[in-house]
């Protein structure tokens, strides 16, 4: 892991290069995804079967997981896992319940009623990865806010494995309240949810993480359906002063690096001695990590430690990065919170490590990446509702403002708009 002692602009340039390196999207992948989406749109289940055999190496007659399979899954998971899952569910619900909003009704004294109706989406699709790692936590994080919002039907898709679907995923889906589960993955699963097939229902919105093919497929179908976000590789920035614990920081950096080779792990510190200790700790901890090959590749390609003169400058640099995860290993981290402008999720102090947010604390772990924390937010209950405005005017209320409407409509050259007002008062030209 490279230690960089440079000025702000040079450090920022280097970080941008790291991010560009982590987000290289080959044109061949985009073309392949576009072809998959088009084929599923046209050939539907036939295309799903073809791509499942091609990419997953299995032939599946019925892609829907039966109720019996879901019930049996609980026999294959540990009681400790179920206990942890239930604790996570409790915390996720208690946090997201506070995000729920009410419809608005505004009645004035002049015969005017205005308002906003908030309604849940009818149905959504949740993508759950099934590649190099299995993510039951993602099931809870994507499904529970939707349930709290009142979504009527939740469909889950996840890639098949040789022995079926990981029972931990099925147990999480059952606990969260998923209505239907399908053994289908990749870009073809996203296309199926967007357009519908003989087996898989069309949904209104698709959420959930995935690999590059899944991310590009979501981009491809956006507009046909809504999506949560186009997630890039995982990323973490740790800001540390001389009080930072090198073991903790190294462990937290590696917690993101182990996701995949394109993940980004950056430490920004005011203390060069700490930087050296973190570098050594990363090497030491890599020796015993089961996913060390992935983590090492990530650290070598997209990892760095930046030395800056002050915490103020560290915060400026972090705001320019707008990371998915930001940890503050500094004195009085709560005081620095006001100066964090752009970050998906912020972890304050040495005992609020990123995995706490990933699994148990309650805030959502579906977060904006690749600098999009400047304008995107974590997944929330709001992502599963839509809003309609409504208004009612009495004749007198409309009469009071009609001249303003006519003036504005005529100024824009939209004379039928003006006439629609005038005709109600016998003033049409």
UniProtKB/Swiss-Prot annotation:
The active site is at residues 324-325. InterPro entries: Ald_DH/histidinol_DH, Histidinol_DH_CS, Histidinol_DH_monofunct, Hstdl_DH. Substrate binds at residues 234, 256, 259, 325, 358, 412, 417. Binds 1 zinc ion per subunit. It is an enzyme of class 1 (oxidoreductase). It comes from the Bacteria. NAD(+) binds at residues 127, 188, 211. It catalyses: L-histidinol + 2 NAD(+) + H2O = L-histidine + 2 NADH + 3 H(+). Keywords: Amino-acid biosynthesis, Histidine biosynthesis, Metal-binding, NAD, Oxidoreductase, Zinc. Signal peptide: none annotated. Zn(2+) binds at residues 256, 259, 358, 417. Its cofactor is Zn(2+). GO terms for biological process: L-histidine biosynthetic process. Pathway: Amino-acid biosynthesis; L-histidine biosynthesis; L-histidine from 5-phospho-alpha-D-ribose 1-diphosphate: step 9/9. Its EC number is 1.1.1.23. GO terms for cellular component: cytosol. GO terms for molecular function: histidinol dehydrogenase activity; NAD binding; zinc ion binding. Catalyzes the sequential NAD-dependent oxidations of L-histidinol to L-histidinaldehyde and then to L-histidine. Belongs to the histidinol dehydrogenase family. This is Histidinol dehydrogenase. It comes from Bacillus anthracis.
């Amino acid at each position: 892991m490279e230690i960089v002692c440079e000025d702000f602009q040079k450090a920022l340039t280097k970080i941008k290069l790291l991010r560009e390196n982590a987000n290289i999207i080959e044109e061949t992948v985009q073309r392949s995804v576009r072809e998959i989406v088009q084929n599923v749109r046209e050939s539907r289940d036939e295309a799903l079967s073809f791509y499942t055999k091609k990419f997953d190496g299995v032939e599946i007659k019925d892609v829907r997981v039966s109720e019996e399979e879901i019930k049996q899954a609980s026999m294959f998971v540990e009681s400790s896992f179920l206990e942890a899952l239930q604790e996570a569910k409790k915390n996720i619900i208690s946090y997201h319940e506070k995000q729920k909003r009410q419809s608005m009704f505004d009645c004035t004294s002049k015969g005017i009623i205005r308002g906003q109706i908030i309604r849940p989406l009818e149905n959504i699709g949740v993508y759950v990865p099934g590649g190099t790692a299995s993510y039951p936590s993602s099931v809870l994080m994507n499904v529970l806010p939707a349930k709290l919002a009142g979504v009527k039907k939740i469909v889950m898709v996840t890639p098949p494995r040789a022995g079926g679907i990981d029972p931990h995923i099925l147990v999480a889906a059952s606990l969260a309240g998923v209505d239907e589960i399908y053994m289908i993955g990749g870009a073809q699963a996203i296309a199926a949810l967007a357009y519908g097939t003989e087996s898989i229902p069309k949904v209104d919105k698709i959420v959930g993480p995935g690999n590059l093919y899944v991310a590009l497929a979501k981009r491809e179908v956006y507009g046909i359906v809504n999506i949560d976000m186009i997630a890039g590789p995982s990323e973490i920035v740790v800001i540390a002063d001389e009080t930072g614990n090198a073991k903790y920081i190294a462990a937290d950096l590696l917690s993101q690096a182990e996701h995949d080779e394109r993940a980004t792990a950056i430490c920004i510190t005011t203390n060069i001695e700490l930087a050296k200790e973190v570098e050594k700790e990363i090497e030491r901890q890599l020796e015993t990590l089961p996913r060390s090959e992935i983590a090492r590749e990530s650290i070598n390609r997209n990892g760095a430690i930046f030395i800056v003169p002050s915490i103020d400058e560290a915060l400026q640099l972090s705001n320019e990065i707008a990371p998915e995860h930001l940890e503050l290993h500094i004195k009085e981290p709560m005081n620095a919170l006001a100066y964090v402008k752009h970050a998906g999720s912020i972890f304050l102090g040495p005992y609020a490590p990123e995995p706490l947010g990933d699994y148990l604390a309650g805030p959502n772990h579906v977060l904006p990446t690749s600098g999009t924390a400047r304008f995107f937010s974590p997944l929330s209950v709001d992502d599963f509702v839509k809003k309609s405005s409504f208004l009612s005017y009495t004749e007198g209320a409309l009469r009071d403002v009609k001249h303003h409407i006519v003036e504005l409509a005529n100024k824009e050259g939209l004379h039928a708009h003006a006439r629609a007002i005038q005709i109600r008062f016998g003033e049409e030209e």
